[in-house]
A protein has these predicted regions:
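Periplasmic plug
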Residues: 1-44
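Short loop/turn motifs that connect adjacent beta-strands in outer-membrane beta-barrel proteins
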Residues: 6, 66-71, 95-96, 131-132
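Short, glycine-/polar-rich solvent-exposed loops and beta-turns at beta-strand/coil boundaries
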Residues: 3-4, 52-55, 115-118
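Outer-membrane beta-barrel domain signature
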Residues: 27, 46-50, 75-77, 111-113, ...
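Flexible, solvent-exposed coil segments and beta strand-coil junctions
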Residues: 63-71, 99-107, 153-170
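Transmembrane beta-barrel wall of Gram-negative outer-membrane proteins
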Residues: 78-107, 112-149, 166-170
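A beta-strand signature from Gram-negative outer-membrane beta-barrel systems
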Residues: 31-75
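Solvent-exposed coil/turn segments that connect beta secondary-structure elements
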Residues: 1-3, 15-17, 45-47, 64-66, ...
Length: 170
């Protein structure tokens, strides 16, 4: 929404649990590691099944589990401005019990002065499957320190676009 505190009109569910924040229906996307997402479904239009303020539709995020995503994976990458990124995931199952863990780490110095950022994310899921049903227990943990926005007067911009007028911009 262009106005802080105004509902987005989009309900977001992670494994069937609503993820929108109470104030303004915003979503803390930094809680969900990319390596933990199995699929996403967009359900357009208003539907009372998805609760209040679902005027623009619903987004359903499905996370991985040890039954559908066994094995491990590690991904490392680098980029401009000293960007470093690491992702790992590991899942498996034995009998009716399944497990899946995933973590993402991102750090960069930023494109402007004093704009370094870091994100740490963890996801864990225990699953139980039987002929009569299934149960999942999930844990999400994240810490983010994203910096980079900030106004810059035109006179300072002409000197160097990498400057920042005020800091810290927390």
């Amino acid at each position: 929404s262009p106005l802080l505190g105004t509902p987005q009109g989009l309900s977001v569910y992670v494994d069937g649990v609503r993820a929108n924040e109470p104030f303004g229906d915003t979503v803390n996307w930094d809680l969900i590691p990319h390596s933990a997402i199995a699929s996403m479904d967009l359900i357009p239009g208003s539907n009372p099944l998805f609760g209040l303020n679902t005027l623009g539709g619903a987004l359903s995020v499905h996370t991985k589990d040890g039954f559908s995503h066994p094995g491990g994976q590690v991904e490392l990458s680098t980029g401009s401005f000293q960007r470093r990124n690491a992702e790992f995931s590991y899942g498996g199952h034995k009998g009716s019990l399944g497990w899946f863990v995933s973590g993402d780490w991102f750090k960069e110095d930023g494109w402007r002065d004093y704009s370094n950022s870091e994100v740490k994310q963890f996801f864990g899921k225990l699953s139980h499957r039987s002929a009569t049903g299934e149960a999942d227990l999930s844990l999400l943990r994240a810490r983010s320190d994203l910096i980079g926005n900030g106004l810059l007067p035109e006179s300072m911009y002409k000197q160097s676009r990498n400057q920042i007028f005020t800091r810290p911009d927390a």
